[in-house]
């Protein structure tokens, strides 16, 4: 689920809201999502981080509006109407958007451009290095060309 966020412009630049929280600390855009950890990640040019999925954890990603990352999703939930379907799209690239990733949806990202790209993500489970809640899938499970720029 892609969620459009507020972005404001003036003569001095721009301002993007990353997340609003209610009085109980819950995300206004996803009140049932309880943030347990917030993480910053930088992707260098040419990097692909894919694919993995979580059994319990859900993610909300935010790519800085003036950066851009190619996002890939693959629905591995057998009870889902979109089971075995995949999609790819760009986050950032001048837009303020958040991406909600439910548990069971494999996700990955690639920086196929020339500059580093930054993202902040919120998760509803704290990372446990001794018992990580994730399953790794091959980066090319959807084909090597999945992560290449399509011309057109």
Where are these regions (language model features)?
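Non-catalytic, conserved peripheral segments adjacent to functional cores
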Residues: 1-94, 112-152
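Structured catalytic/translocation cores of nucleotide/phosphate-coupled proteins
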Residues: 92, 99-100
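Short beta-strand His + acidic residue motifs that chelate non-heme Fe in jelly-roll/DSBH
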Residues: 99, 107-113
């Amino acid at each position: 689920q892609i969620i459009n966020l507020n972005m404001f412009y003036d003569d001095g630049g721009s301002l993007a809201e990353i997340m609003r929280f209610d009085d109980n600390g819950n995300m206004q855009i996803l009140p049932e999502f309880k943030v347990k950890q917030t993480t910053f990640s930088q992707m260098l040019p040419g990097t692909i981080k894919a694919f993995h999925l979580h059994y319990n954890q859900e993610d909300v990603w935010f790519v800085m509006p003036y950066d851009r990352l190619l996002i890939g999703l693959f629905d591995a939930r057998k009870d889902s109407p979109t089971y075995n379907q995949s999609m790819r799209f760009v986050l950032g690239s001048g837009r303020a958007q958040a991406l909600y990733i439910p548990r069971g949806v494999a996700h990955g990202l690639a920086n196929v451009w020339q500059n580093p790209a930054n993202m902040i993500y919120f998760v509803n489970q704290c990372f446990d290095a001794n018992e990580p809640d994730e399953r790794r899938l091959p980066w090319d499970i959807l084909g090597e060309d999945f992560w290449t720029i399509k011309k057109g």
